[in-house]
Amino acid sequence: MWKFIKSATDQNNWLEHDQNEIVFWGRSNVGKSSLINALASQKIAKTSSTPGRTRLINYFETQRKKIIVDLPGYGFASMSKKAQSKISGIIDFYFRNSKNSKNICILIDAKIGFSYIDLEMIDYLKSLGLLFDIIITKIDKANQSQKHRVKQQALTFSDDINIFMVSSEKKQGLSDLVEHFEL
């Protein structure tokens, strides 16, 4: 059984542990929390139709004792510049200073594809020397052409990244994530 462990506002209350972290990050409203709930088969992460609701670093533990980190989304439209700046600073500090090794998963909405800000965040991760995988979400809401386009975009990044296509709502592709990350 998965469980919520804690929320952290900054490095002073990060979860202290010695495990690899599986980090979910993407644009606001891309489905990070919904994906966690679908993988857990229970509602342990708060979801909202309003973008930018996750403003803390949230830690979860899988039944196999893996640590999942739900980061606040980027591209928050309904948030003040001050709040955006604070969250960006927390995330930057986390990526630069957290001692735990990380499997970073960039989540991309299948209908929207890679936006300019997604590409900026990928460049940012590369500039830090961090590796990442791509999880294409909401595939049940995209048509065949949109799914093909976003997958082709994802394939341009590198041969070493894993690409997953999932639907939290229809439970599609979840077993691939469970198997790959040993959740």
Swiss-Prot record:
Q: Which UniProt keywords apply?
A: Cell cycle, Cell division, GTP-binding, Magnesium, Metal-binding, Nucleotide-binding, Septation
Q: Which GO terms describe its biological process?
A: division septum assembly
Q: Which cofactors are reported in the record for this sequence?
A: Mg(2+)
* Molecular function in Gene Ontology: GTP binding; metal ion binding
Keyword Transmembrane present in the record's keywords: the answer is: no
Which of this chain's residues are annotated to bind GTP? 26-33, 52-56, 70-73, 137-140, 166-168
Lipid biosynthesis keyword on record: no
Question: Which InterPro entries does the entry link to?
Answer: G_ENGB_dom, GTP-bd, GTP-bd_ribosome_bio_YsxC, P-loop_NTPase
Q: Where is the EngB-type G domain?
A: 18-183
A family per Pfam: MMR_HSR1
Q: Which residues form a coiled coil?
A: none
Q: Where does Mg(2+) bind?
A: 33, 54
Q: Which Gene3D superfamilies match?
A: P-loop containing nucleotide triphosphate hydrolases (3.40.50.300)
Q: What does this protein do, in the record's words? A: Necessary for normal cell division and for the maintenance of normal septation.
Q: Which family does it belong to?
A: Belongs to the TRAFAC class TrmE-Era-EngA-EngB-Septin-like GTPase superfamily. EngB GTPase family.
NCBIfam families in alphabetical order: GTPase_YsxC (TIGR03598)
Protein name, per record: Probable GTP-binding protein EngB
Q: Which gene encodes it?
A: engB
